[in-house]
């Protein structure tokens, strides 16, 4: 499998150069998912043609890729956080896993969980399990 950095670079290039972005391909590649025909159609439904995909074309540009871009928020908000904080990553995450250490090192006492069998799109892969974890976390941290 490709590393997260390589996949991210390919996604940026694809979003910049493609005229009709492959939404299903992105979901399957980044999430490690194999969508059924029905699921694939559901992901494509909001975008009947490439001209409707302006939003997805800018998705990669909305992600801060350098810590310096949001350093002020890390210091002002996260490093001074005094409330419960839940961090969840899929055990097979390849895209954002590099951020895990930032959360562990910079947020005081985060609760960090690893979602077994999940990759990047945890809400798709283990949605009910994730919902229960979030619900329990909220109930146990009023």
Question: Which role does the model predict for each range below?
Answer:
Residues 23-35, 42-48, 60-66:
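Helix-loop "lid/cap" segments that line or gate small-molecule binding pockets
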Residues 1-19, 23:
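Flexible "cap/lid" loop of the alpha/beta hydrolase fold
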Residues 110-142:
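Catalytic active-site module of serine/aspartate enzymes centered on a nucleophile-bearing elbow/loop
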Residues 17, 46-48, 98:
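Ligand-binding pocket scaffold of soluble enzyme catalytic domains
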Residues 43, 56, 87-90, 103, ...:
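Generic structural signal for small/hydrophobic residues in well-ordered secondary structure
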Residues 51-105:
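Conserved serine/cysteine hydrolase catalytic core
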């Amino acid at each position: 499998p490709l590393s997260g950095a390589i996949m991210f670079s390919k996604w940026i290039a694809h979003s910049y150069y493609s005229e009709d972005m492959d939404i299903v391909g992105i979901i399957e590649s980044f999430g490690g998912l194999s969508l059924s025909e029905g699921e694939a159609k559901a992901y494509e439904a909001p975008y009947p043609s490439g001209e409707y995909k302006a939003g997805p074309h800018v998705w990669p540009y909305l992600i801060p890729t350098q810590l310096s871009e949001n350093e002020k928020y890390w210091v002002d908000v996260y490093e001074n956080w005094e409330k419960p904080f839940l961090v969840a990553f899929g055990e097979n995450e390849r895209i954002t896993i590099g951020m895990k250490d930032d959360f562990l090192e910079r947020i005081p006492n985060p609760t960090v969980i690893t979602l077994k069998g999940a990759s990047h799109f945890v809400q798709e892969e283990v949605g009910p399990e994730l919902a229960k974890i979030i619900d329990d976390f909220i109930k146990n941290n009023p």
